[in-house]
Amino acid sequence: MNTIEGTGTKPANVVVRGNASGFLQEIVSGAHQLRADEPVAVGGSDAAPGPYDYLLVGLGACTSMTVGLYARAKKWPLENIVVSLRHSRIHATDCAECETKEGMLDRIDVEIGLNGALTPEQRAKLIEVAAKCPVHRTLKSEINIRLRTAPSGSLSESVVTKVESRPTETAKRTAEEKI
């Protein structure tokens, strides 16, 4: 399998399985099992975060990890990081710094709390570093999403098996060791 250029890591493989009668989705990402849903107001059961929540989770986690990694490498006194994110749709005319001038566009507001005895210069550098997290850069770059139809039945059985299986004892021990 190819690696993601410049990272040495393999591309993520996520499988999402849903029932056509509702919004609740079962998600398998490596050894992790998640769910996604929509709020009751739009027809979901609000049993799990929604798709935009997961988008924000990815950006927030990557931002926090990147800032923490940089601060540790510099041995700066950063105690913890809190990243708060909000997604909204706005009119392009309400965004002076945006290239798009007509219609609607997506906005993600990010607030970063940096706790610790940091100098103003260190805080400014950490905010600069936050904008360089890989997920932030992906969202700001051109994205080519290739959609195709899988052969009938080729995904359904393997996904059911993965979603319904329980972690092995080895997987449980590995997860516990990471904690």
Describe the residue ranges of each PLM region.
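Extended beta-strand/beta-hairpin segments
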Residues: M1-V57, L69-I179
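Conserved phosphate/anionic-ligand binding catalytic regions in large, soluble enzymes, centered on
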Residues: T66
